[in-house]
Amino acid sequence: MNFTGKTAVVTGGSRGIGRAICLELARGGANVMLCYAGNEQAALDTVAACEALGAKAAAMRCDVSKTDEVKALVDAALQQFGAVHILVNNAGITRDGLLMTMKEDAWDQVLDTNLKGAFLTMKAVARTMMKQRYGRIVNLSSVVGLHGNAGQVNYAASKAGVIGMTKSLAKELASRGVTVNAVAPGFIDTDMTAALPQAARDALLPTIPAQRLGAAEEVAQAVAFLASDQAAYITGQVLAVDGGMSM
């Protein structure tokens, strides 16, 4: 994919899937502004990796649930690179637990980051994208948002909400040349899944027709396609990258 002359804002871009997305966009020539929640060194490492690919990149700490911090992130991207053409909402957290024992804080934290965060960033870039009559917004949902998962009522609600928000905003912005799509990863080999006991990892495989975990790069390639000019006639869609789990 060719992203020469394009600027992308990627939330949660320092590690895992977010890092892979930053590198994939940088590989195509995009300027990358990534935000991170707390791991500054990981963010700087990702910036350096993007620059090694020949791209311009920068990182900024941002709590995506805070309106002023999101505005500062987008303003920084506009000031440094002149425009924002692509937004990838990847920032997300989990606070798993069964409904009967889940604390209200665990619900609020997940919805604030995963759902409100995507709302705030989309709102922050919508005006500039509409004005330039070009934009690509890609939101990271999850197969859990499609099918639910015991012990993840908060995470499932947030990711299902992302899908509904994606489809609604796609209808609002389509006439202005702005597409809004979602990618729903399945079980991807990241730090989060690596922390699972081997027995739990082994139990996952029978639920995946492809019989393996996905790679972060495979999610990134799907995101890059939806962020590209080749996907100009695709909007309001959810692309599952899950080895067939959603069949």
Language-model regions, residue ranges each:
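Active-site helix of classical SDR
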Residues: 122, 158, 166
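Substrate-binding pocket helix/loop in short-chain dehydrogenase/reductase
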Residues: 98-99, 103-111, 204
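Alpha-helical segment proximal to the catalytic Tyr-Lys
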Residues: 127, 171-175, 232
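Conserved glycine-rich Rossmann-like NAD(P)H-binding loop of the short-chain dehydrogenase/reductase
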Residues: 30-45
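Short, small/polar-rich loop/turn modules that mediate ligand/substrate recognition or access, typified
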Residues: 82, 174, 179, 234-236
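Conserved glycine-rich cofactor-binding loop
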Residues: 7, 14-16
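Residue(s) in the substrate-gating loop at a strand-loop-helix junction
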Residues: 142
